[in-house]
Amino acid sequence: MNQQLKNLTLPIYMDYQSTTPIDPRVMEAMLPYFTTKFGNPHSRSHSFGWEAENAVENARSMIAKLIGADSKEIIFTSGATESNNLVIKGIAKFYGNKKNHIITLVSEHKCVLNACRYLEQEGIKITYLPIKPNGIIDLEILKNAITDQTLLVSVMAVNNEIGVIQPLREIGKICRERSVFFHSDIAQGFGKIPINVNEYNIDLASISGHKIYGPKGIGALYIRKKPRVRVTPLINGGGQERGMRSGTLPTPLIVGFGIAAEISYNEMEKDAQHVNYLFDRFLNNIYSRIPEVYLNGDKDQRYKGNLNLSFAGVEGESIILAIKDLAVSSGSACTSASLEPSYVLRSIGISEELAHTSIRFGIGRFTTEQEIDYAVNLICSKIDKLRKLSPLWEMMQEGIDLKKIKWTAH
């Protein structure tokens, strides 16, 4: 292992689902808009404003191109959390007098689930659909859940915890046939997997800048123009972004977001090949050296930059402490402060014991083969040590069912 350390910088970043480092090309494009090109894009009376507006519109076009949309259908927001809130609350407010039912999945991101819970208090009926043990939606259950009161179906493209890719095309077809709006939080899939809003009949899509090697604090919402979808804005003000999101646009962040989208558009295939190769290398080496390791979520229908693994018999928190040379997480970054087992893992039927042993490893554009090999060696040696110390692992080897143990409180 010492030999491996020569050209490695520790800790190794493996938390690409929570955020990504800024691509140097993105940073370079942003810098002038912090210094000499500082105009307000809404100032129409001088060249500083025109220059900023042109930069914003170029970025808007690039973001639209990545999902096959028209640039007029892209609204800038502060991130995917705001976009999700704007869709779910805004569409319910606009159409709530006509239809009052929204469908989503139990495994959606917390901001979607909590926005839905907020609406329940306002009298909107929410259906939280279960998912199959592989993490994928059951399309028959979706079909049966839609009623004549259903306004919106909200299903994320790629799950942030387990990486599974939902069948967006099939969901979009069902929604279009039943005249229901289809929203997808595509933050984890945008720029990583091909997504076309017209082919998939997506009416609204939430996007984040910092998941695609762009800056934090900027995101977007795609809102279909034909057939037109309406939302009531959350923020009132000067009427920017076609009245849907008032406030002065942050030109440097938008420029960075646009360049990040352009790079993703041009290099998506190259990035995917790189990530897929490292995924296979990582997983095959782990499987060959450690018994009783489980990949959570469907192995094939997933974005392979996400490996959520359960290591039976060892607590996730103790693994994180043992492998502190790797920046990883247990659960999503938004909920990793909680000691509760991940609600996403519980929703695919994983036992509480196994859910507590889960770690999410992220692979991205800047991950190297050397880093993967170092990570595998470190994980294997530490898991082996932790299992030797673990009475739970010992009991499992003796065939004792942990569910039947009666624990004594002290």
Swiss-Prot record:
According to its UniProt record, which reaction does this protein catalyse? (sulfur carrier)-H + L-cysteine = (sulfur carrier)-SH + L-alanine
What this protein needs as a cofactor is:
pyridoxal 5'-phosphate
A GO CC term attached to the entry: L-cysteine desulfurase complex
The main enzyme category here is transferase
Q: Family, per the entry?
A: Belongs to the class-V pyridoxal-phosphate-dependent aminotransferase family. NifS/IscS subfamily.
Q: How does it assemble?
A: Homodimer. Forms a heterotetramer with IscU, interacts with other sulfur acceptors.
Q: What is the protein name given in its UniProt record?
A: Cysteine desulfurase IscS
The scientific name of the source species is Rickettsia typhi (strain ATCC VR-144 / Wilmington)
Gene of this entry: iscS
